[in-house]
């Protein structure tokens, strides 16, 4: 162990070199801080073992020498540019780990208590994989001790012996590759997506810085080895994994374009699976991280510590897939920027991952009540300003006297507020009843029931107010109201409460003046007073119900029905008398008329030009035919002579009638003549009626 310290120096010297490297490169310190989250999640036992392995095992650069010279001497890949990129990638990773070791040393004392529990689990995990690594580790330690000496001595001059040593080391690594792969598949590979992305980003940033100092490169390689050893797994697994990655990088340099495409496809599928896994793990991150969250300073550390709590199977599967993805990214020349861009597009920035859980899902602070709008109830509510309007109101002082009484006037008393004027005075009102201001029915009495006042002049000519009412207070304390000739008893009673006030009206407002404490009531003094009598009469009239339906006795027949019958008989008698008078008048007029005229016999053929004796009347023919038939019917009767005489008389009357009608037609004109002809035909059809009328007339004349 003394030889190892002489070769590599003590831990204090390594820490001093780390500080110098930190001050030398400021840009590398930022990614180093990001990667320190996973180092803090490791256990103290791992750190102890890492210190031992760091003292025993050499760094990658000491084993293999400079990558650029290795590529030139070995002729495995045949391309100098690819080896230079792999060298730059490893150099960048080493520079990143330099800062991580410093942060781990600072936080080592604070995280010892938290890593004790994880130490037991890591020891159990390392025990499962110790057997397959024992042989490889033994051979590696023996070979590495010699190689480190050669690497330290030949680093300054870059001699050919270093290339030969590198070739021998490569052969040893090829022999141990199968064993390392088997141990890697059985063990756990706790690598996080954030570290891989940081490694890819650091590769781009450090491509221009590949000519840094050899001393810093060796220190960076040691820090890189410690970075992988600080993870919550065994040191042998991480060292073997590092060596296997270097060997695979050399093999991938010689692969063709088809191999690079296949590795890119596998990397894309692995990234998709990891993305789904990270989305499912975001929900349980707060519960699983627990104590680790308190030691992290930013959101990226939270995501890395959350990855350390995953199950063993998921971590192992992710480590194998990410190893392939990282190898393909380091080997590819043109596809490396595109792969980094795809990874950043898939996973995003670490700040974006934790921003949603920190800000959006943060519960409200207890003890602060919130209202429906999300505002604190403790905040004072804004009160609306009061609107004040200054108004000047004159103060009214009234002389209310010594005593103030509240009076509710009964219905038999009333007060006239206006002064009495004989010119407009009305003794009695037309309406017997009226409604007061309160809607009660009030009796309209005469002067003795209305309190009035007036203004008159005294002997000196001064105005004096008189009233027809006064209150008299007797020696026993009782009072009475004298209103004209009527006397009313006055009763005093106290008022309960301050609910009755005296106000003075001013425009639309009221101004209070006093508070009533006593009330007065009035009653008639005796039942003999006029007020009492009139009041009782009004009550009697109000109580007596008027009978709206009258019942009359039915003696004999209904006089209305008899009256209607008598009116009908009287009308019939008048019509009969009028008819007789008209018939008698006609008979008298016909006696003075002449014989028949041809003008009226033919009303249908009447024409002024065709007037003459040659025209024949149809009515005359009909009468002639009827007369002959009646004569034949009377042959067998015993009264044939009498009938013949009657027929002669009728024919004469008819002829006279026709003559009179004809003369009237000449006077009235053509239109009136046609109307009369129609009336004559109607009369001819009513011949028996004419006979009856004529018989009656003859009987009356005989009488």
Curated annotation (Swiss-Prot):
Region annotation (Disordered) ranges: 1-391, 553-572, 578-613, 627-703
Acidic residues composition bias: residue spans: 1-15, 370-384, 661-670, 694-703
Single GO BP term: transcription elongation by RNA polymerase II
Main location: nucleus
Annotated Low complexity bias: 23-42
Coiled coil: 242-279
Gene Ontology MF terms: RNA polymerase II C-terminal domain phosphoserine binding
Polar residues composition-biased segments: 74-92
Feature: compositional bias, Basic and acidic residues: 53-64, 105-116, 123-188, 197-317, 557-572, 578-592
Record-level GO cellular component terms: Cdc73/Paf1 complex; nucleus
InterPro entries with a match to the protein in the record: Leo1
Localization annotation: Nucleus
Keywords: Activator, Coiled coil, Nucleus, Transcription, Transcription regulation
Family matches, as Pfam families: Leo1
Keyword Endoplasmic reticulum: no
Lineage top rank: taxon: Eukaryota
Subunit structure: Component of the PAF1 complex, which at least consists of cdc73, paf1, leo1, ctr9 and rtf1. The PAF1 complex interacts with PHF5A.
Family per similarity comment: Belongs to the LEO1 family.
Record PANTHER family: LEO1 PROTEIN, RNA POLYMERASE-ASSOCIATED PROTEIN LEO1
Function comment: Component of the PAF1 complex (PAF1C) which has multiple functions during transcription by RNA polymerase II. PAF1C associates with RNA polymerase II, is involved in transcriptional elongation and in histone modifications including methylation on histone H3 'Lys-4' (H3K4me3).
Protein name: RNA polymerase-associated protein LEO1
Organism, scientific name: Xenopus laevis (African clawed frog)
């Amino acid at each position: 162990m003394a030889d190892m310290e002489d070769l590599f120096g003590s831990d204090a010297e390594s820490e001093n070199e780390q500080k110098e490297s930190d001050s030398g490169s400021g840009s590398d310190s930022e990614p180093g801080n990001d990667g320190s989250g996973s180092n803090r999640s490791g256990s103290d036992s791992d750190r102890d073992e890492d210190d031992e392995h760091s003292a025993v095992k050499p760094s990658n650069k000491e084993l293999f020498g400079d990558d650029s010279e290795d590529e030139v001497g070995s002729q495995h890949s045949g391309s100098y540019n690819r080896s230079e990129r792999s060298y730059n990638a490893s150099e960048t990773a080493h520079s990143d780990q330099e800062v991580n070791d410093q942060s781990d040393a600072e936080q080592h004392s604070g995280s010892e208590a938290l890593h004790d529990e994880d130490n037991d689990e890591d020891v159990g995990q390392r025990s499962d994989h110790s057997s397959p690594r024992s042989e490889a580790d033994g051979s590696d330690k023996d070979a590495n001790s010699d190689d480190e000496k050669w690497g330290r001595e030949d680093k300054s001059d870059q001699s050919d012996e270093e290339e030969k040593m590198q070739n021998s080391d490569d052969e040893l690594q090829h022999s141990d590759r199968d064993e390392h792969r088997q141990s890697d598949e059985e063990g756990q590979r706790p690598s996080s997506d954030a570290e891989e992305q940081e490694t890819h980003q650091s590769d781009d940033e450090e491509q221009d810085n590949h000519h840094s100092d050899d001393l810093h490169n060796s220190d960076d390689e040691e820090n890189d080895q410690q970075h992988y050893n600080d993870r919550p797994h065994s040191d042998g697994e991480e060292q073997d994994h590092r060596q296997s990655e270097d060997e695979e990088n050399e093999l991938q340099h010689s692969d063709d374009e088809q191999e690079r495409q296949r590795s890119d496809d596998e990397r894309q599928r692995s990234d998709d699976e990891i993305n789904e896994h990270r989305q499912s793990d975001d929900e349980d991150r707060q519960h699983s991280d627990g104590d680790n969250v308190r030691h992290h300073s930013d959101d990226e550390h939270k995501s890395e510590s959350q990855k350390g709590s995953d199950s063993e199977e998921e971590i192992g599967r992710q480590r194998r897939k990410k190893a392939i993805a990282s190898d393909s990214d380091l080997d590819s020349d043109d596809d490396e920027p595109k792969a980094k861009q795809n990874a950043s597009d898939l996973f995003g920035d670490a700040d974006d991952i934790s921003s949603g859980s920190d800000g959006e899902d943060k519960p409200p602070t207890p003890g602060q009540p919130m209202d429906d709008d999300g505002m604190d109830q403790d905040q004072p509510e804004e009160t609306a300003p009061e609107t004040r309007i200054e108004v000047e109101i004159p103060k009214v002082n009234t002389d209310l006297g010594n005593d103030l009484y509240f009076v509710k006037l009964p219905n038999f008393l009333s007060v006239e507020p206006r002064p009495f004027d004989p010119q407009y005075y009305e003794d009695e009102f037309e309406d017997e009843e009226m409604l007061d201001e309160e809607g009660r029915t009030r009796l309209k009495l005469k002067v003795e029931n209305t309190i009035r006042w007036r203004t008159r002049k005294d002997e000196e000519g001064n105005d004096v107010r008189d009233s027809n009412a006064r209150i008299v207070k007797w020696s026993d304390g009782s009072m009475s109201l004298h209103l004209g000739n009527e006397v009313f008893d006055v009763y005093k009673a106290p008022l309960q409460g301050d609910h009755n006030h005296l106000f003075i009206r001013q425009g639309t407002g009221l101004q209070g003046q006093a508070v009533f404490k006593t009330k007065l009531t009035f009653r008639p003094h005796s039942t003999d007073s006029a007020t009492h009598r009139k009041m009782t009469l009004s009550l009697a009239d109000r109580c007596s119900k008027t009978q709206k339906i009258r019942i009359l006795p039915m003696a004999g027949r209904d006089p209305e029905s008899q009256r209607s019958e008598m009116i009908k008989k009287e009308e019939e008698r008048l019509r009969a008398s009028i008819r007789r008078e008209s018939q008698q008048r006609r008979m008298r007029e016909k006696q003075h008329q002449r014989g028949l005229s041809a003008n009226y016999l033919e009303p249908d053929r009447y024409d002024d030009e065709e007037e003459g004796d040659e025209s024949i009347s149809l009515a005359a023919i009909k009468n002639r035919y009827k007369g002959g038939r009646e004569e034949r019917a009377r042959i067998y009767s015993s009264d044939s002579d009498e009938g013949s005489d009657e027929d002669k008389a009728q024919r004469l009357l008819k002829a006279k009638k026709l003559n009179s009608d004809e003369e009237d037609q000449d006077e009235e004109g053509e239109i009136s003549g046609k109307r009369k002809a129609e009336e004559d035909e109607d009369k001819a059809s009513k011949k028996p009626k004419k006979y009856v009328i004529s018989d009656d007339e003859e009987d009356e004349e005989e009488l």
